[in-house]
From Swiss-Prot:
Single GO MF descriptor: rRNA binding
UniProt-listed InterPro entries: Ribosomal_uL15 (IPR030878), Ribosomal_uL15/eL18 (IPR021131), Ribosomal_uL15/eL18_sf (IPR036227), Ribosomal_uL15_bac-type (IPR005749), Ribosomal_uL15_CS (IPR001196)
Keywords: Ribonucleoprotein, Ribosomal protein, RNA-binding, rRNA-binding
BP term (GO), one: translation
NCBIfam families, per database record: rplO_bact
Name used for this protein in its record: Large ribosomal subunit protein uL15
One Gene Ontology term, aspect cellular component: cytosolic large ribosomal subunit
General function of this protein: Binds to the 23S rRNA.
Subunit structure: Part of the 50S ribosomal subunit.
Organism: Pseudothermotoga lettingae (strain ATCC BAA-301 / DSM 14385 / NBRC 107922 / TMO) (Thermotoga lettingae)
Length: 148
């Protein structure tokens, strides 16, 4: 049986730390493996990855495009086809009910009802937004649309 104190790292997997600047006999003395002069020999002499010498950097070569609208709403989407299949006449449908039954993963900024599919029974639908076609389809069969 292997004991915890018997465990050893695989030979060759653990290398000794490189001690630099400890005399010329060590092989890493004087310039500590950095060579002579130049930016990379200095104390904080790193060249950032976005620097490209004298060439115009990529972020300045590419045009400025678009933006993220901070008023954009990310709705959870439900089509009336789903409401037709899963609910019976005169049911009251709320975002919480849709979430509970697993028709949407999360409410996000609200629920939007879209008009894909046919609706034949009246339903009371409460949601944050409706497409025009969905609103028309729900009201045409005698249902109610309520924006919350």
């Amino acid at each position: 049986m292997t004991k915890l104190e018997d465990l050893r790292p695989t030979p060759g997997s653990v290398k000794p730390r490189k001690r630099v600047g400890r005399g010329i006999g060590s092989g890493h003395g004087k310039t500590s493996g950095r060579g002579h002069k130049g930016q990379k020999s200095r104390g904080s002499g790193k060249v950032h990855m976005w620097l490209e010498g004298g060439q115009t950097p990529l972020h300045r070569r590419l045009p400025k495009v678009g933006f993220k609208s901070f008023t954009h709403k990310n709705y959870a989407i439900v089509n009336i086809r789903l409401l037709e299949e899963k609910f019976s006449a005169n049911d009251e449908i709320t975002p919480e009910l849709l979430l509970e039954k697993g028709f949407i993963k999360k409410i996000k900024d609200g629920v939007k009802i879209l008009g894909s599919g046919e609706l034949t029974k009246p339903l009371i639908v409460k949601a944050h937004a409706f497409s025009n076609s969905a609103k028309k389809a729900i009201e045409m069969v005698g249902g109610k649309v309520e924006v919350i």
